[in-house]
Amino acid sequence: MKNNNSSSVSIENHPWKKKPTTLLLFLSLLSISLLLLRLSQDKIILITTTKTTATTGTDHQRSHKSSEDDTCLGRYIYIHNLPSRFNLEIIKDCKSITRPKDKISMCKYLDNSGFGPLIGGKSSDYSPSWYATNQFMLEVIFHEKMKSYECLTRNSSLASAIYVPYYAGLDFRRHLRRRNVAARDAAGKELVKWLKKQPQWKDMSGKNHFLVTGRISRDFRRNSGSRSAWGTNFMLLSESLNLTFLSIERSLTSHNEFAIPYPTYFHPTSTPEILQWQEKIRLTNRTVLFSFAGAQRPSRNQNGVVRTEVIKQCKSSSKTCRFLDCDVNANSCDDPISLMKLFESSTFCLQPPGDSLTRKSVFDSILAGCIPVFFNQGSAYKQYLWHIPKNSSKYSVYITVKELRTGGKNKIEEILRGIPNERVVGMRENVIRLIPKIVYAKPNRNKPDGEILEDSFDVAVKGVLERIEGIRRNEFKTD
């Protein structure tokens, strides 16, 4: 009994019994501590999740948006991470893509994201956005711009198109004079073999894939096994027929090729810079009626005959036509400033075909506000369907071969002089309006919300997406 009583007294006399508030205080502190611990854990989880989202890229964040909020819906593009032998190793070995006759090493042209050396410092008339850009650098330029494309995704299932950054033109340049056709064709065959093994190929058998070639179509359409035959067979491979090709000149009979402009010398950083240039050339004093910059070509085919006649007529109209003979080294046809000054001083710029139907000069002259004069429908009208208007008479002059050869020694001058001045002014303004769509702006171009000016890259990407969406609707319907 004593022990029980003692025990009973002990419990009753315990401090918690004497002071009930002490127990309540202890329990309150314990609850607060547990709550703080939970909040701390939640914060750690929140921080970790935020960091993970940031490192997965913009595409991951956008994938959680509703379709109404996602401005990239239908515009997502996935870039294949190709083995380096298809791009980086080609330009790393830049000496191999330089030909003996090249006045400047191709290594120099790879500077500044493929834009080449700066030329702005040579003349106050040209801003730091002017470069000595080589006509064959489009593959590198397009790849660099694609890396900054606003709707890239690392999730290929979200992509409306798959970009294949293979430098086909530069690769061909390495093997330009090799008589071993197997060596010339090797990379193209290896590429399609690699593509077919990727899960992205299975979705549409490659019909949602596209790539850019910085050379004309003919260079990839060798249909002979002869060692003396020109080019590679890349575009004729069965898998290649499913791809969409963007080339500086397309085959007019091809169903999967689309021509996009040659790169010019101007690569602006912002819309105001483009507008400023347009205003400058509107006010330019044009003292020459027409001009031609180029070299003589053999008269073995009609293209050579046309060019020979154009040069002859320009020389015979020496008071109204300026001829920059690119066969003469002293004329500096490789100097962008010399060419631009010629085109800026001319009302019309003659664009006869040469080695092929198209010329880089077409876009350099448009950049200068000079009205192009064509002698073949395939030099522009049937080529650049996404970039130039269908109504060709609004911005250019077309002279048929028959008119050229049977109209007398000054037929070109006669036709151009006969165009009313009011029409010339309107044509020039239409040419100037084309400028934003024929230049490749810098990859890091300042493009604020509400930007309405599209550059050549923007127009090309839009065209690719629309084409692939059309194929998806027509050939891959799901009920």
From Swiss-Prot:
Cytoplasmic domain ranges by topology: 1-20
EC number: 2.4.1.-
Membrane association type: Single-pass type II membrane protein
Tissue: Expressed in roots, hypocotyls, cotyledons, leaves, stems and sepals.
Subcellular location: Golgi apparatus membrane
Topological domains annotated Lumenal: 41-479
GO BP terms: protein glycosylation
Residue ranges crossing the lipid bilayer per the database entry: 21-40
GO molecular function, one term: glycosyltransferase activity
Glycosylation-annotated residues: N155, N242, N285, N391
One Pfam family cited in the UniProt record for this chain: Exostosin_GT47
Key word Signal present: no
Keyword terms, alphabetized: Glycoprotein, Glycosyltransferase, Golgi apparatus, Membrane, Signal-anchor, Transferase, Transmembrane, Transmembrane helix
InterPro entries: Exostosin, Exostosin_GT47
Summary of the function given for this chain in its UniProt record: Functions in xyloglucan synthesis by adding side chains to the xylosylated glucan backbone. Involved in the galactosylation of hemicellulose xyloglucan.
Family stated for the protein in its record: Belongs to the glycosyltransferase 47 family.
Protein name: Probable xyloglucan galactosyltransferase GT15
Organism, as annotated: Arabidopsis thaliana
